[in-house]
Every structure is written in C-alpha cells, then in structure tokens.
Amino acid sequence: MAEYEVIVIGGGPVGLFGTFYSGLRDMKVLLIDSQDELGGQLVTLYPEKMVYDVGGFAGIQAYDLAQRLIEQAKMFGPDIRTREWADTLEKTQDGMWVVKTDKGGEYKTKTVMIAAGIGKITPSRLGAKGEVEYENKGVYYTVRRKSEFQGKRVLIVGGGDSAVDWALTLAPIAKEVTLIHRRDQFRAHERSVKEMFEVAKVYTWHELKEVKGDGNRVTQAIIFDNRTKEEKTLNVDAVIISIGHKGDLGNMLKWGLNMKGRDIVVNGKMETNLPGVYAVGDIASVEGMPKLALIAVGFGQAAIASSVAKKYVDPNASVFAGHSSEMDKFKK
C-alpha cells in the first residue's frame, strides 16, 4: 500500500495550493480529485470567467489561474489521482489513516487535508416549464464558452455573484442581456451590481415561469412579477439559470467529522476533531471566524494546515519554515 505524509482531497484552487505548500514543507504528497481534470470550479464551471479577488492579479481568466495553480502544485512531484472519489477514511492501529477510493485505491497517510469544496457539483434547477426540454438547446447553468452567446439575446436568472458577473461578461458581446431576480437585493459585490444596471435590463421581483422554443432551440421566456403575478414574454436565444449548485459530499459525512451543516468545523489551526485531519477552503468552518468563501482565504488556510501537518508528522519541525525567497529550494 502506497504511504504518504499528507493526502490532499480535492483538486480545486485551495487543494492545489495545499499540495504545493505541503511539498514546499518537504512532505510526500498525494492529491486525489474526483473530476477528470484539476482546477475545480475554475475549470468545470466557468473557465472563461474573470477572477479579480486573488492577490497579484488585477484580473485573470479562471482557466489561466487554474493552469498556474496546477503548475505550481506539481513543482515538488506529488502523486496525483484524478477521477477517484475519496470514499472512506479509516484509522489504523499504528495511528495512521487509510483513504479508500471508489476505484479501489487504498492509500496510507500520516495526515489528511480535506479541500473538497462543496463536493461533487450539480447545478440547481428551477423546475420551470420547458427548462429540462431545452437544456443545452438554449438553457444553460453556466458559461463555459462566451463565444456561444455572441450576438444573442440572453436572459440570466439569479442574484448572486455568478449571475451578476455573467451579465457584465456577456453584455459587450451579446445582442441584449436581461437579468431577473426574485428579490430586490443582490448577493454580489456592490460595484458589480451598480455596473450591471448600466449594461443590462434588470427586473427585480421577477421569476422564470416557462421556457419556450421551436423544439430545437429556445425562442422565448415567460417571466412574472412575484408580487402582482403579472406576466411578460421575452424573445430570447439563451437562458442562463445561475441560482447556485448542489454539492454531494458522499460518504465523507460518515467519517466521524464534527460538522456544522455541510461544513467541517475546524479551529484556528485548521484542525478537525480527528487527529491529523485538517479541512480548508469552502468546506471549512473556522470556529469564531466569519466565513468568506474566497480563494484567497483558502490559500492562507492551506498554508496553515500544511505547516501544522508538518509539525504533526515531525514534532521537531518548526511550524513556520521561513519565507520562500530564503529557501534553498528556490535558489539556483
């Protein structure tokens, strides 16, 4: 059975950085991810979306950010297993952990870093009439290629960051962008909301009732005011339903972790209630701290978890190993 000092579960941005930092701390690392390719939501959901809230970049395309993180994660030669789902976590008699996967893999490790985000992702659906019928025929749940919306009349449903960001992203290339939200308050950055009102038609207190088409593609959408019930028919070529995604954590919920809803509870050292097991990123809920689901926050958590794990593996090691600019690893 292969043996490691740390197994990182989850190949999104935080897991990738945790893989890099664990390698920086000279630990033998295995990264396990259930997707076909590394990068998490940056790659699977919005590869062409611009990311602005990561330090060092005034703006970077999600796919490009993922590629840089993957390159960084591979610097110290970690083992990587994609298309494998971490199924069980078991404690051995010698105090180590064994991670078993759905593909029959068994991996022994001294520590585990869980960076699983919200788990396996599926889009949240509205249940509007015609929604399923026209899925991938004009009804979408994310934007993988902006070019598909060039010159089209686009309706966006949602009021969060993703919905607002897609309105801003598509406005310059689409023929027309309309956004509807069931409330009049948006769960997005204030500046982005302000800019959205300048470039898109916005209907607050409105919901999607029905998607219509000619059998091959979307041609219309019926929306309604949820206060007055008044309906309005819009001529559209595409409907983007951006109301979030559902995550499946699978058997992780049975691992004996202290959970708060769907989050794993950790202390300031990113330690869970299981010795040698840490949680970072969107899946972690730090006691006494506000939750900010930001990549930048996850990077810091991953560095903390890696450093604390190093001390767990080697009690003589320092938690803080110094600045990377001073390390021999990077001196040529």
Curated annotation (Swiss-Prot):
Organism this protein belongs to: Metallosphaera sedula (strain ATCC 51363 / DSM 5348 / JCM 9185 / NBRC 15509 / TH2)
Which keywords does this chain's UniProt record carry? Answer: FAD, Flavoprotein, NADP, Oxidoreductase
**PANTHER family xrefs:** THIOREDOXIN REDUCTASE 1-RELATED-RELATED (PTHR48105)
E.C. designation(s): 1.18.1.2
**Subunit-structure text:** Homodimer.
- SUPFAM superfamilies, sorted: FAD/NAD(P)-binding domain
If you read the UniProt record, what top EC class would you report for this enzyme, in one word? oxidoreductase
Which family does the entry's similarity section mention?
Belongs to the ferredoxin--NADP reductase type 2 family.
Q: Which GO terms describe its molecular function?
A: ferredoxin-NADP+ reductase activity; flavin adenine dinucleotide binding; NADP binding
Question: Know the name of this protein?
Answer: Ferredoxin--NADP reductase
Q: Which reaction does it catalyse?
A: 2 reduced [2Fe-2S]-[ferredoxin] + NADP(+) + H(+) = 2 oxidized [2Fe-2S]-[ferredoxin] + NADPH
Query: What high-level taxonomic lineage is stated for the organism?
Result: Archaea, Thermoproteota, Thermoprotei, Sulfolobales, Sulfolobaceae
Q: Which cysteines are joined by disulfide bonds?
A: none
Task: Kindly state what the record says about how the cofactor is bound.
Answer: Binds 1 FAD per subunit.
Q: Does the keyword RNA-binding apply?
A: no
Q: Which cofactor does it need?
A: FAD
- The UniProt annotation places FAD binding at D33, Q41, Y46, A86, I121, D282, S325
Q: Which InterPro entries match?
A: FAD/NAD-bd_sf, FAD/NAD-binding_dom, Fd--NADP_Rdtase_type_2, Ferredoxin-NADP_redctase_2
The record's annotation in Pfam families points to: Pyr_redox_2
